[in-house]
Amino acid sequence: MIVVTGMPGAGKDEFVKVARSLGFIDLHMGNTVREFAKNAGIPEIDHEIGNFATSERKKYGMDIWAVRTAQKITDDGRTVIDGLRNYEELQYFSKFSENPYVVAIFASRKDRFSRILKRDRPDDIRTMEELIERDTRELSWGIGNVIALADYMIVNDDTLETFHARCRKLLTEKFSISNKI
């Protein structure tokens, strides 16, 4: 099992796309949050969904989003989970895999802001101030700790093609995955 972490807009989804092309099954913790938020009638606005995620963590524990996402795991050996936000979530995923590997994706705030604006998801931020607010919220959840403890770090500071190549190299060399899958 590979669990991916990184600040918003760092490139986690792109890492997952490469992993999927190599035969991994992908799960997205953010999709789980958005699904539960929608069912609770929460508007598709970044700070509303973020507040909902925080509220659920306070009610049910810091690992609640891991608990809810893990229900969808079908093959722990070939699963990539996108969106690790804290150590408690990592501990929970350890129940499904003896040694889940943490891959952290890093990109500058400037690059992340530009990418977020381009992807144009309905619940995304629209201003630098909103990104700073979101970064602060995610840091309060403990994301900095899991980034610091990552087994592998990929820097996303170049073209998309270069980043994909870095992802493919890590997956094929460290996880013995064939480039031909």
UniProtKB/Swiss-Prot annotation:
SUPFAM superfamilies: P-loop containing nucleoside triphosphate hydrolases. GO terms for molecular function: ATP binding. It holds the Pfam family AAA_17. InterPro entries: NTP_hydrolase-rel, P-loop_NTPase. Keywords: ATP-binding, Nucleotide-binding. The keyword Nucleotide-binding applies. ATP binds at G6, M7, P8, G9, A10, G11, K12, D13. It comes from the Archaea. The keyword Transmembrane helix does not apply. Belongs to the UPF0200 family. This is UPF0200 protein Ta0179. It comes from Thermoplasma acidophilum (strain ATCC 25905 / DSM 1728 / JCM 9062 / NBRC 15155 / AMRC-C165).
